[in-house]
From Swiss-Prot:
Component of the anaphase promoting complex/cyclosome (APC/C), a cell cycle-regulated E3 ubiquitin-protein ligase complex that controls progression through mitosis and the G1 phase of the cell cycle. The APC/C is thought to confer substrate specificity and, in the presence of ubiquitin-conjugating E2 enzymes, it catalyzes the formation of protein-ubiquitin conjugates that are subsequently degraded by the 26S proteasome. Pfam families: Apc13p (PF05839). GO terms for biological process: anaphase-promoting complex-dependent catabolic process; cell division. The lineage of its organism: Eukaryota, Fungi, Dikarya, Ascomycota, Taphrinomycotina. This is Anaphase-promoting complex subunit 13. Keywords: Cell cycle, Cell division, Mitosis, Ubl conjugation pathway. It comes from the Eukaryota. The APC/C is composed of at least 13 subunits: apc1, apc2, nuc2, apc4, apc5, cut9, apc8, apc10, apc11, hcn1, apc13, apc14 and apc15. The gene is apc13. The keyword S-adenosyl-L-methionine does not apply. InterPro entries: Apc13 (IPR008401).
Length: 135
């Protein structure tokens, strides 16, 4: 393999004379001939006829094929669904899931670790109302 790095063993004194030339030598850039069955598939962009409005047509087709992304990830519903599992404990260390749910059903949601992230997400969506998709 001529294109891979390798070590030169200086076991003969004449090798030193050619070492600098060997490091400077570059392989020529040649076209590699590949059989038809080994070629990659042709993309749609290469199959189309190139004319002045070809790029506009391709962009419009891509926009029509684009599926809209989710805007709402429904993280609040996810936190609400699993917040009662976490629960909280009272002074004796006993679990008081039922007590918390009866007094304030959203208390465990407010104490959930995802609450700050949900609040930041709400603020971000409010500031960027013109944003259409999450990327």
């Amino acid at each position: 393999m001529d294109s891979n790095y390798n070590y030169v063993h200086m076991n003969k004194p004449g090798v030193v004379l050619f070492a600098s030339d060997w490091l400077k030598d570059r392989l020529p850039v040649d076209d590699v001939e590949v059989r038809v069955e080994h070629l990659p598939p042709v993309t749609e962009d290469e199959m189309t006829i190139q004319h002045s409005s070809a790029n506009l047509i391709l962009m419009k087709n891509k926009q029509l094929r684009h599926e809209p992304a989710w805007k709402d990830l429904e993280l609040e519903d996810l936190v609400n669904a699993f917040a009662f599992i976490q629960g909280s404990s009272n002074a004796e260390g006993k679990n008081t899931i039922e007590d918390n749910f009866e007094t304030d059903p959203f208390k465990s949601v407010k104490e959930a670790p995802m609450a700050p992230f949900l609040e930041a997400n709400r603020r971000h969506q409010g500031e960027h109302a013109s944003m259409r998709y999450f990327r």
